[in-house]
Amino acid sequence: MRTDWILADFDDTLAPGDSHAGLLRYILRRRLWPLLLLPVIALGGLVYLVPSRRRQGISLIWWAITLGLSPLGWRKLVRAYCRTRPGLFCEARALLMKDGDRCWVISASPRVLVRGQLHQQLPGKLPHRTLGSRMHYRLGGLMPRFYCHGQHKILPEIRALTVTLALSDSLHDLPLLAQGAEAWLINPTPLRLQKAQACLPHIMTKRWRL
């Protein structure tokens, strides 16, 4: 059994930007009529601000924006959006090229979205495992069946690993970062770094660029 696993967030950690929010905006711009459901989208945004209700909030947003979208249309939009993404940070690309076979990428973004971006950037060199939010259809729209965010990233299979390195840009991922013997905070603001160090004094900062 390996004892040198790496756990990595995706958005703003391996690649710049929030591809989850970006995909939602991309779908909305190409469908437009879900703007009629803007009150539902806004309500979802407000509910999302309540930490214990994040999954319900993001589900409302997803449902309103994807209502009536076919599975084929969903796959086409994901593929098209992946082609617009800027790529991986140079340091992230080097990490995955060298150590991808021991890397678990764990993201709040839909798994199909993360895998699509990784496949485009590293064809034939995907990480050991890619975990993300699992989507399903309900009442005519898409929503997360499982929202892989924050503490929920620490799945039983993750707890069973011996992790040498964990990396993320987000304070929501402190539980993930705490799994690693070594932890990297990617491109933090001074305030974010201060908050992270209060919980994980050993955390290191990394400045990554495209």
Predicted segments, located by residue:
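Metal-dependent phosphoesterase signature
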Residues: 56-91
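A residue-identity detector for tryptophan
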Residues: 5, 33, 62-63, 74, ...
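Short amphipathic alpha-helical patches
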Residues: 34, 38, 46-51, 66-70, ...
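C-terminal cap/substrate-recognition subdomain and adjoining C-terminal extension
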Residues: 1-2, 82-210
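Active-site neighborhood of HAD-like aspartate-dependent phosphohydrolases
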Residues: 1-53
